[in-house]
Amino acid sequence: LYQAYHDQEWGTPQRDPALLFEMLLLEGFQAGLSWITVLRKRERYREVLHGFDPLKLSQMSDERIEALMLDAGIIRNRLKLKAARRNAQAWLAVDNPAEWLWSFVGGKPKVNHFVGRSDVPAVTDEAKAMSKALQKAGFTFVGPTICYAFMQATGMVMDHTTDCDRYAALAR
């Protein structure tokens, strides 16, 4: 599962607003946990969170959140579930959220040339700026580390290391 995600999705530039929203929420759900935990629960999240439809999520009731707290198929964290609802509301209030998010890297992927994984930073100035702007717009669970992981996952920054099979394909 993790290898497939790495080989087929991570670091590939993504401009689809629906997938960007999904990834932003998943990165928030991951806070304090391993990414593989989130990947294993991703399909269940899609089922119970209306396919990550921001309009439907923005209207999720407190009762629905409480019901989701009983679902072992997801990460049962009330704050993260409420953040998903709040982030959906904030997402809907942003004019062209995909373009806005991509603006933090100048609208095109920032290709890095890291040799080893230890060279890859956890946070960058762009991620700090994105985090600050998202928080100002009403988003939660969007600290700089989460934002940088989001930028990596969606290909806003290309952090496959130079010895990775995906590097050559994505560095073009």
Question: Each predicted region: which residue ranges?
Answer:
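HhH-family (HhH-GPD) DNA N-glycosylase catalytic core used in base-excision repair
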Residues: 1-172
